């Protein structure tokens, strides 16, 4: 458990030095390059996940895009473009944020953690996984 906490702290400290990639506005013009702290928290999470997950390919099955684990019945291709992978990442992250909505400002933190290790390892699953230490501390 200590290793996980140290890993999370290292991830956060490393991500502070990562610059966000150039964003395109809706009219197609490139906006000026922004640093990570000039982005919204949700955009920061997307940038960090994209950076550390990388684009998964056929050899990474059952993971596609930026770490999306295929669910039964889903038909996403392992050859998806970076844009398609980002759309899927944003969709997954929004779903996880909604799952943790009751935790208020910490919902994005929990969503990013759940994207990495799975929501049931954060929430706990009777008989399989205990509730995560991070969640226990937030509830205290």
Where are these regions (language model features)?
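Cell-wall polysaccharide-cleaving catalytic domain and substrate-binding groove, primarily
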Residues: 16-108, 112-140
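Sec-dependent N-terminal signal peptides
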Residues: 5-14
């Amino acid at each position: 458990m200590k290793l996980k906490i140290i890993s999370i702290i290292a991830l956060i400290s490393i991500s502070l030095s990562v610059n966000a990639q150039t964003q395109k506005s809706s009219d197609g013009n490139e906006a000026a390059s922004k640093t990570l702290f000039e982005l919204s928290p949700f955009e920061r999470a997307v940038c960090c996940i994209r950076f550390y997950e990388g684009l998964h390919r056929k050899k990474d099955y059952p993971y596609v895009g930026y770490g999306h684990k295929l669910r039964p019945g889903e038909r996403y291709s392992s050859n998806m473009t970076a844009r398609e992978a980002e759309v899927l990442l944003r969709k997954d992250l929004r779903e996880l944020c909604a799952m943790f909505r009751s935790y208020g400002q910490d919902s994005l933190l929990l969503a990013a953690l759940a994207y990495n290790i799975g929501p049931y390892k954060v929430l706990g699953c009777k008989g399989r996984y205990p509730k995560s230490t991070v969640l226990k501390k937030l509830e205290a």
